[in-house]
Amino acid sequence: AQDPRVHVRLYDGLALCFLGFPDQALRLCADARRYADASRHPFSEAMAQTISLRVHQLRGETATVAGQANAAIALCEEHEFVHYLAMSHILRGWARTQQESFEEGITEIQEGLSKERAIGALLFETYSLGLLADACIKNKRYTQALEFLQQVKLDEENTDHFYAAEIHRLLGETY
């Protein structure tokens, strides 16, 4: 079970961030975290921590993601929330790629993505591959970025299109 007040605010926050309202997104995520913390419901807490990290990542807030990812990882490990554990590793890996630990970060993102694939949780596969490609582009590893982008399946079978525009932008940068 999960607290619907938390769930709705988090996904509304993600949507607002993509629509160009990052400050409103952050406020909704903060509300969700307050509800989750007050409920003392571990799954809602894990969801709130991890999805809030995504919003911080989308805002480019590397230090915040790096500083909060370990707490999300610890909570998810304690309660064996495999999906949110994998996402927390992916986000911490992204932060590492931005903080001069490129190789370690890429490895952590790949390991998180492998865990997601192993449990069939492919909802944010496109997003994760985009993070890998973006980190490679920033480090002038265009061939490696293209390899990650070629794994993205933007077809009718895959309904994960929320990151499609960013994937196309990244493809443009690799050429």
Please give the residue ranges for each predicted region.
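Short, flexible, glycine-rich and Lys/Arg-enriched loop motifs at helix boundaries
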Residues: A1-P4
